[in-house]
């Protein structure tokens, strides 16, 4: 497989993507990812198998709530089933999108691997990447208490359905980790360029142009997946907030499982948004730095360059924007929009719940 010249988790992420069929290609030395026909056929068969199993998985997963000792309301069961359906659909869409764009994905992975040979992740970036990987592992291990408590009472068909459901749930989490790792790598490139002395301005502009093209390819390839990731994570957070507030108002307690799940989802989503925001900030700083240096081509004075050279040659190409499907830009302002929407949602839930209490409905 591809060997990144640093112990940073990117190699593990790539391997994990291949195991979960998010990277339907074969990797080998030296630093080459290739699409092969037999790998494509296996990926297509796996996707068709998972698609055909999806209704069975949802049916059996919904029946698992009857096997527990906890009494769930019909509203809670409906929300849980809708959340599971969303996870399944998003995971299948991610797998299908990568299968359809496997050649572009392989080329992008090759470019990122070559980039990482020259620009290694810093130890801070490595630390944050591993923390996010461990957070995904913690999210997966949260299902262990349920299996210990109700696993013995469940038939084998429901256990299989629960395992496949965990696979669908983990695909989105691992996908987000891959997006986070790729953005961290490109962010590290901007950080190192910002620290370098501008001895050759033409080379600096060339690097700025190459980073911009790479990020544009990255956003174009993953924009559908990022949109689904943000949508699915935000909906799951809203559902967990509803379950948390409903439990708190009716039973006057704090459900640790629900609160932990909501916190993990929020941290994972914000990590991706923050990395994209910092990447855009570093790109803007690099562009401003290039403009302040007043680059003049060799053999021309500044007056001659201003008079005879087209404007785009004298300036950087533009700012990096993580514009997702033309709907939103992945930055801190978008995160503040999500937070404000969530706060309004909490207020509506509390108001509705207290009105029901006053009318004796709870």
Curated annotation (Swiss-Prot):
Protein topology in the membrane: Multi-pass membrane protein
Chain segments annotated as coiled-coil in the UniProt record: none
UniProt organism field: Drosophila melanogaster (Fruit fly)
Membrane topology (Extracellular): 60-74, 148-166, 245-255, 355-362
Major subcellular location class: membrane
Protein name: Putative gustatory receptor 89a
One BP term from GO: signal transduction
Family membership: Belongs to the insect chemoreceptor superfamily. Gustatory receptor (GR) family. Gr77a subfamily.
Cytoplasmic topological domain: 1-38, 96-126, 188-223, 277-333
Gene Ontology CC: one annotated term: dendrite
Subcellular compartments: Cell membrane
InterPro entries registered for this protein in UniProt: 7TM_chemorcpt
GO molecular function annotation: ligand-gated monoatomic ion channel activity; taste receptor activity
Keywords: Cell membrane, Membrane, Receptor, Transducer, Transmembrane, Transmembrane helix
Positions of transmembrane segments: 39-59, 75-95, 127-147, 167-187, 224-244, 256-276, 334-354
Matching Pfam families: 7tm_7
Function noted in UniProt: Probable gustatory receptor which mediates acceptance or avoidance behavior, depending on its substrates.
């Amino acid at each position: 497989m591809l060997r990144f010249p640093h112990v940073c988790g990117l190699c593990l992420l790539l391997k994990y993507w291949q195991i979960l069929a998010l990277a339907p290609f074969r990797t080998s030395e030296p630093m080459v990812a290739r699409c092969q026909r037999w790998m494509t056929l296996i990926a297509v068969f796996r996707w068709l198998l998972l698609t055909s199993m999806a209704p069975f998985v949802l049916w059996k997963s919904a029946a698992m709530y009857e096997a527990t000792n906890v009494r769930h309301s019909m509203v809670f069961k409906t929300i849980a089933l809708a959340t599971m359906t969303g996870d399944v659909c998003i995971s299948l869409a991610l797998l299908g999108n990568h299968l359809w764009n496997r050649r572009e994905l392989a080329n992008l992975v090759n470019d990122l691997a070559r980039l990482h040979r020259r620009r290694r992740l810093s130890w801070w970036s490595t630390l944050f990447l591993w923390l996010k990987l461990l957070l995904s592992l913690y999210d997966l291990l949260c299902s262990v208490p349920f299996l210990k408590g109700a696993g013995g009472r469940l038939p084998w068909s429901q256990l299989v359905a629960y395992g496949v459901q965990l696979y669908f749930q983990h695909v989105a989490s691992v996908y987000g980790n891959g997006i986070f790792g790729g953005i961290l790598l490109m962010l590290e490139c901007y950080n190192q360029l910002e620290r370098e002395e501008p001895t050759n301005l033409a080379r600096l502009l060339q690097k700025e142009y190459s980073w911009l093209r790479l990020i544009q390819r990255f956003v174009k390839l993953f924009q559908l997946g990022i949109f689904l990731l943000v949508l699915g994570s935000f909906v799951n957070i809203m559902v967990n907030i509803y379950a948390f507030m409903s439990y708190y108002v009716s039973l006057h307690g704090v459900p640790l499982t629900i609160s932990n799940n909501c916190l993990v989802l929020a941290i994972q989503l914000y990590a991706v948004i923050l990395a994209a925001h910092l990447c855009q900030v570093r790109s803007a700083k690099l562009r401003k730095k290039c403009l302040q240096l007043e680059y003049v081509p060799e053999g021309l004075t500044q007056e001659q360059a201003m008079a005879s050279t087209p404007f785009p040659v004298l300036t950087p190409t533009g700012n990096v924007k993580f514009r997702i499907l033309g709907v939103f830009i992945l930055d801190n302002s978008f995160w503040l929009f999500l937070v404000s929407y969530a706060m309004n949602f909490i207020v509506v839930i509390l108001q509705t719940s207290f009105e029901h209490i006053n009318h004796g409905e709870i």
